[in-house]
Amino acid sequence: MTFILRLRKVSLCLTAAILFLVAESAPAKTIGNHTAVYNAQGTLQPWTSWNDCLEREMKWYLNCPVENGYPRFVCMTFMEDTYTLRSDRPDFIPSMQNGMGIISYLKYYQHIEKKNPKVLEFARAMGDYLVKESLTPDTGKYPRFTRSTGIANRFPQPPDCGSQADHPYEIQPDKGAIAGYALALLYEETKDQKYMDQALQNARVLVDNMRVGDDTKTPWPFRVDYRNGEPRGQVCSNLSFMLRLFEKLDQLGHHEFNSAWDNLWDYIRSRQIPNLATSGSLWVQFFEDYEIQDNKNAWAPLNLARYLIEKKDDINPRWKEYSKALIDFTNKHFTSIYDGVLICGEQDDDRSPWGGILSTYGAVLAMYSAATGSEEYKGLAYQAMNYCLYAVSDDGCPGENAKEPNRGGWQEDCHTDKIHNLLDAMAAFPEWAK
């Protein structure tokens, strides 16, 4: 028996040695721009600390050349790693890209205790572009409203600048809400009245065009012709930024939006959230480059969950239940496994782990975990954000996703809709940043 046990032990040792040699000879797995690092339990680890990754990326962007009064990335969506426009993609998403960019840069400015004035300077540049260069004409149903799409390096955008899936004279109401909210935050930081004036203009235009929603249409359509208000796509899934805009303006002394906030929250609570458990038809349409009208997306439910987690009982005592329903809807429809990590895609028609949506997923799950004390999503949040950050190169230049090695691309995915998410996850669990 002793002899047999010794043989088994020798056999196991030989097997382990062979497996070690095979592993050593196999090429290392690459995620994004780096060799993947896993711990003994198979959990994806950061390629560098989150703090270091953040500083590398911010340094790379703060070195971006300034032309026509703006850092180049402010005026284009498809930027190469040479800080230049990708020649085959002149299309541009000013409100989403620069609105989320302002939010990211203001949050980072607070993170560094306001020690680098260039960060605020770049946030102001994004705000200035929205206010000065990206408005509809002062006529029609959506006058002087920030454009959802346009053309790179135009100063200002022409009246017929609609691009991607927008028609030439179309805007997206929810993107105006994103821009308006960001401009209100920028006013709060700088006290520059032009940012407040545009935030108020966007909000007032939204209120003027608000309609009664039901089970087939939301209080605003997804797209409208700004000249006559003709809708295209009756459902706009991203309503949380209208709530944010109205609330922030109220906090800044403009109380005219309280009724609109109340009516909108009542619609979300009574119609949109219950729709998660049925067809999901009120969670379709968000991304500027799509016009498929039954295309559910992850961005809108995750950002509503973020808002509820931030507000907690101040908005509704059922905030935990609602937030979990929004996260579970996202997990059900948009997640898949890449390299052993549960990642989140954007929409029914695109499940790739783009930087904007994956960092949103990681941040919101981290915030929920910290706010509730639940461990259910905590590990998923950590690995999702780790995966996302593998897209950042050693020099700080990010790619648009970590699915394969790449540098540059969609600036919203590379950078502007990512930094604020990383900071939110770091605030939820500071130990993850070290």
Q: Could you describe each region identified by the protein language model?
A:
Residues 32-39, 90-110, 162-164, 168-188, ...:
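Well-ordered alpha-helical segments within folded domains of soluble proteins
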